[in-house]
Amino acid sequence: MKKTGYFLLAVIVIVAAAGVGYWKFSGNPDALREIVLEQCLPDQLQHQNPAPCAEVKPRAGYVVFKDRHGPLQYLLMPTYRINGTESPLLLEPATPNFFWLAWQARGYMSKKYGHDIPDSAVSLAINSRLGRSQDHLHIHISCIRPDVREQLDNDLTRISTRWLPLPGGLMGHEYLARRVTESELAQRSPFMMLAEEVPEARDHMGRYALAVVRQSDDSFVLLATERNLLTLNRASAEEIQDHSCAILSSR
């Protein structure tokens, strides 16, 4: 009976998670792609005006777009079709290092805010295939949650240069963490680091969400969480962010 009970519980959890996914995807999953390919890119190429994007870089292959959620949240997106973390294009050497480009674009937050925002308050995140609402790759550039900031500060010396479980996880979910230098982040995509260094990740990249956070010693911590429906983890690394930017009012 115990085994039957566990099986039924697992079925209920999976069905519930699928229901959440259906609700999340019930809108237009191509809305961001249409903005990039049908508005921002043509306007830049034809009129040298990036609107409605904040910036369009056709040769570099990306745009920066002000998200409607939160006063300071921006998105970095490719100027061509890449769905998300599951795309094999992200593991090709010729593909831009979108996380590094997103980090370089963090200045838009300060410009919008009207004051310099410290790097320690900024985070980058991309959600998994199930954890996202849009089918065009987009990296969230936004504030970090104050409690996540505090936890990562406390774990500073315990985060290795190898992918290892983060003690206690984050937001009730298991996370892997890896420390990198600024030079490493600039030269090598976090997508490649995950695919090449975590067993079996390459074959299941769509299950993963990734985040990048600056540490007080000027290193960066890469965070990765894998979808697990039994624990109701849809792998949405955006959960470590706070789009209201409460961390700025506490400084």
Curated annotation (Swiss-Prot):
The chain crosses the membrane at residues 5-25. The gene is cdh. Its EC number is 3.6.1.26. It is a single-pass membrane protein. It comes from the Bacteria. Pathway: Phospholipid metabolism; CDP-diacylglycerol degradation; phosphatidate from CDP-diacylglycerol: step 1/1. Its main location: membrane. One of its GO terms (cellular component) is plasma membrane. Coiled coil: none annotated. It catalyses: a CDP-1,2-diacyl-sn-glycerol + H2O = a 1,2-diacyl-sn-glycero-3-phosphate + CMP + 2 H(+). The lineage of its organism: Bacteria, Pseudomonadati, Pseudomonadota, Gammaproteobacteria, Enterobacterales. Keywords: Cell inner membrane, Cell membrane, Hydrolase, Lipid biosynthesis, Lipid metabolism, Membrane, Phospholipid biosynthesis, Phospholipid metabolism, Transmembrane, Transmembrane helix. Gene3D superfamilies: HIT family - CDH-like. It is found in: Cell inner membrane. It is an enzyme of class 3 (hydrolase). GO terms for molecular function: CDP-diacylglycerol diphosphatase activity. This is CDP-diacylglycerol pyrophosphatase. The keyword Lipid metabolism applies.
